[in-house]
C-alpha cells in the first residue's frame, strides 16, 4: 500500500514524466535501459499494471515500456530458436520492481 502511495505522489507531482508528443521516438537513458533489462530477466511478459508502474518509476509511458518488451522478446526469439517460453503475463510485485530500480540507481 505504501509503495502505491509513493507511485501516486510521483505521478501527481511530475505528470510530464509519462508524456510525449504523438509519433515522437522515445530515447531511453542508460538507467532506463538497465532497469528494463533487469525486469525482463525477472519476467519477459509483465502485466499491463507492471508496465504502468515501471513507466512511472523510470519516466516512460506504459506504451513505451510495452514496445520495449515486445522488441526485446522479438530479438530474443531469433536467438532462442527451439526454446519454448510460456506466453502468459507474469505478475511481479511492486516491491520487486522498486528493488530493481533501487539496485540500478546504486549501479
Swiss-Prot record:
- One of the GO biological process terms: regulation of transcription by RNA polymerase II
Q: Which InterPro entries match?
A: HD, Homeobox_DNA-bind_prot, Homeodomain-like_sf
Family annotation (SUPFAM superfamilies): Homeodomain-like
Provide the GO MF annotations for this entry: RNA polymerase II cis-regulatory region sequence-specific DNA binding
**Claim: DNA-binding is one of the keywords in the record:** yes
Q: Matching SMART domains, A to Z?
A: HOX
- Which subcellular locations apply to this protein? Nucleus
Question: Membrane-crossing residues?
Answer: none
Could you tell me the keywords of this UniProt record? Answer: DNA-binding, Homeobox, Nucleus
Descriptive protein name:
Homeobox protein HD-7
